Regions:
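Phosphate-binding P-loop
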Residues: 3-8
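Conserved glycine(s) of the Walker
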Residues: 15, 20
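Small-molecule kinase domains that catalyze NTP-dependent phosphoryl transfer to phosphate-bearing small molecules
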Residues: 110, 143-211
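Flexible beta-alpha connector loops of hexameric P-loop NTPases
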Residues: 74-80, 138-147
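N-terminal phosphate/diphosphate-binding loop that engages ATP/GTP or pyrophosphate donors
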Residues: 22-72
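Short hydrophobic/aromatic beta-strand immediately N-terminal to the Walker A/P-loop
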Residues: 10-12
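A short helix-turn-beta junction within AAA+ P-loop NTPase domains corresponding to the substrate/partner-engaging
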Residues: 35, 118-125, 164, 168-170
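ATP-dependent NMP and nucleoside kinases share a basic, alpha-helical "lid"
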Residues: 62-72, 86-142
Length: 211
């Protein structure tokens, strides 16, 4: 049974901007290198030093639109005139090979991937310890004006946090390493669920028969 390939799981991280999603994912992958990222598809031009299929899959606007129409792109967003999306085939092939995936997606993106892979996806919502702390973290990033920060906080309160009931787990990101360990504990528990290990368990001789 040790040689059997267990189907991988998809851990999807969502939450308000500034709650620390990227830091949590990076810390989790550093502690557990068996976690894998998903290569996204984009309409952005390839840059020097980038490789097809490693950094992104590069498509024209027409090709991207076709992938949306055919359902191959599960979710997508637009930034600075370029589209970025998640490929269904990219996820399917990796979890079939036993790879455990971790993704940072918008709330609508998380719900879309969960709908496409209901038995394989686990959704985790990240909360800040307080709204005041969320504001502080957004200010610390030095990326946005005060008006933009207020808009992000307002969006978190009115649109994002109310969606928390659609997620499987909720983690409050106060101390990064604690949140990382909680996330890894969630992934470990999900790996050990019976429905994810039925084929392996069926190969074990647990009848206890004696001659």
């Amino acid at each position: 049974y040790r040689n059997m390939t267990r189907r991988g799981i998809i851990t999807i991280i969502s939450g308000p901007s500034g709650c620390g999603k990227n830091s949590i994912i990076k810390a989790a992958v550093e502690k557990n290198p068996l976690l894998s990222y998903v290569t996204s598809v984009t309409t952005r031009e390839i840059r020097a030093g980038e490789s097809e299929g490693v950094n992104y899959y590069y498509k024209s606007q027409e090709e991207f639109a076709h992938l949306i129409r055919t359902g191959e792109i599960l979710e997508w967003d637009e930034f600075c005139g370029n589209r970025y999306g998640t490929l269904k085939s990219e996820i399917s092939s990796k979890i079939a090979a036993g790879m455990d995936l971790i993704l940072d997606l918008t709330i609508s993106g998380a719900i879309a991937v969960k709908k496409a892979f209901p038995e394989d996806a686990v959704t985790v919502f990240i909360l800040p310890p307080s709204i005041e702390e969320l504001e502080t973290r957004l200010q610390y990033r030095l990326r946005e004006t005060e008006a933009q920060i207020r808009e992000r906080v307002s969006n978190a309160l009115s649109n994002e946090i109310p969606q928390i009931g659609n997620f499987d787990y909720v983690l409050i990101n106060d101390v990064l390493n604690d949140t990382r360990d909680q996330l890894l504990a969630v992934i470990t528990a999900e790996r050990l669920k019976y429905n994810r290990n039925k084929e392996i368990l069926e190969e074990l001789d647990l009848k206890g028969e004696t001659v």
